[in-house]
């Protein structure tokens, strides 16, 4: 990889790390922030769900805009908007201001991921592209791991401090992008017209895909993976506050442990386990394991026990998503892009539904998010036993032919 490409990828990696650091930092803070404004679980769930909802809507739009206007201006807009949203969070004194800040940040930060990936595709050879995307993935993971711990620690004295710091880092990163990152898409290579984004057609395709097998079952699994994880993460701060009296620092470290365990699990265990047992078997076992861990979490009474049960939940959940993605890819040997797009859409739906559901049932009883989450994962396990083919059935067919 050329020196200029390495420099550009370093700037892009910093951009993604900053954005994901911001997302990670707010997770342990939100529960305490909204409680100080008199809100509870239902408001927290809706606040968290805004981000994946806006990303689902606006990421394709930003990708289309970058094809016409270039990558650099879209990336700059995303960083500027995200920095402003963090500043608004820090200045918020009422609940509605949090929702406005979250919405603005989600809409504009949705530009960063598709644009950085497109930048790498523009500026690297096919041989170097995988390495470049891998570096961006590592930066994303680093931001998500460090964010909760850093946010929880910075919020000990003031809940606003992490937001102001993130806003400042965003603006510094914006300067790096504006001053040192060249445009990767020449004017002659840009589209003259916008790509048509048709949400109704996308929803129709998602509905048709659900009726096919095994694709529909795998898409259901993709939904359940995200639903289970966000059901846990979204409400955990309020659960920890009500059950144990934990503050932002303890919640931040616990969520950081989730990120570390997930990264180690996916890096070390996913390959050997799926190679040995096959993706279908891994999906079935991890669905049941995640459900059991949800119930065990309710029995934990000390910090070591909480960490242990959360690790027991994180390991199978971390194995589940790559197994679902891999099996979806194998069962769609043609039209891979359609299959992966559907997988991402159902993943986003799970990230929207999980925190909303957890927040509303938390207001009924603080144990219900995890009990209901366990029940839903058990239902997924039963569905996988009945309808998910085993490893020996590997023949793939085109996605559209089945939907």
Each PLM stretch: what is its role?
Residues 1-5, 182-219, 402-403:
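Juxtamembrane intracellular "pre-TM" segments in multi-pass secondary transporters
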Residues 28-42, 235-250:
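Short amphipathic helix-loop junctions that connect adjacent transmembrane helices
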Residues 38, 70, 91-97, 108, ...:
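Helix-breaking motifs and short loop linkers at transmembrane-helix boundaries and internal kinks
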Residues 56-93:
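Conserved MFS/SLC helix-loop-helix module at the cytosolic interface between two early adjacent transmembrane helices
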Residues 59-69, 265-279, 362:
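Helix-to-loop junctions at the C-terminal end of transmembrane segments
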Residues 101-142:
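Cytoplasmic helix-loop-helix junction between adjacent transmembrane helices
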Residues 136-179:
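Helix-loop-helix hairpin linking two adjacent transmembrane segments in secondary transporters
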Residues 280-324:
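C-terminal transmembrane helical hairpin of 12-TM major facilitator-type secondary transporters
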């Amino acid at each position: 990889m050329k020196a200029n490409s390495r420099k550009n990828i370093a700037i892009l990696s910093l951009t993604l790390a900053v954005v994901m650091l911001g997302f990670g930092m707010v997770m342990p803070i939100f529960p305490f922030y909204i409680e100080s404004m008199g809100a509870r679980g239902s408001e927290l769930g809706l606040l968290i769900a805004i981000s994946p909802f806006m990303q689902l809507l606006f990421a394709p739009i930003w990708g289309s805009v970058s094809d016409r206007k270039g990558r650099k201006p879209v990336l700059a807009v995303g960083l500027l908007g995200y920095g402003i949203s963090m500043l608004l969070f820090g200045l918020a004194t009422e609940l509605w201001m949090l929702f406005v800040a979250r919405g603005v940040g989600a809409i504009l930060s949705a530009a960063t991921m598709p644009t950085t990936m497109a930048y790498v595709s523009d500026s690297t050879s096919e041989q170097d592209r995988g390495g470049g995307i891998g570096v961006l993935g590592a930066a994303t993971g680093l931001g998500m791991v460090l964010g909760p711990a850093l946010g929880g620690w910075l919020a000990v004295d003031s809940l606003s401090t992490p937001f102001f710091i993130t806003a400042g880092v965003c603006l510094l990163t914006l300067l790096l992008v504006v001053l040192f990152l060249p445009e990767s898409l020449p004017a002659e290579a840009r589209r003259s017209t916008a790509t048509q984004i048709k949400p109704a057609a996308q929803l129709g395709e998602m509905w048709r895909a659900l009726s096919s097998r095994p694709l529909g079952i795998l898409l259901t699994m993709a939904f359940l993976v995200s639903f289970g994880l966000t059901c846990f993460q979204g409400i955990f701060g309020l659960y920890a506050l009500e059950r144990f009296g934990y503050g932002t620092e303890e919640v931040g470290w616990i969520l950081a442990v989730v990120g570390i365990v997930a990264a180690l699990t996916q890096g070390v265990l996913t390959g050997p386990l799926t190679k040995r047992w096959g993706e279908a078997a891994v999906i079935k076992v991890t669905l049941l394991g995640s459900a059991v861990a949800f119930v065990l979490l309710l029995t934990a009474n000390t910090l070591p026990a909480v960490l242990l049960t959360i690790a027991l939940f994180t390991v199978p959940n971390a194995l589940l998503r790559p197994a679902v993605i891999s099996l979806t890819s194998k069962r769609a040997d043609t039209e891979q892009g359609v299959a992966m797009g559907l997988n991402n859409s159902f993943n986003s739906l799970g990230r929207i539904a999980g925190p909303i559901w957890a927040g509303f049932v938390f207001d009924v009883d603080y144990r219900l998010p995890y009990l209901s989450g366990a029940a839903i994962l058990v239902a997924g396990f039963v569905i996988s036993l009945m309808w998910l083919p085993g490893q020996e059935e590997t023949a793939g067919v085109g996605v559209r032919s089945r939907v």
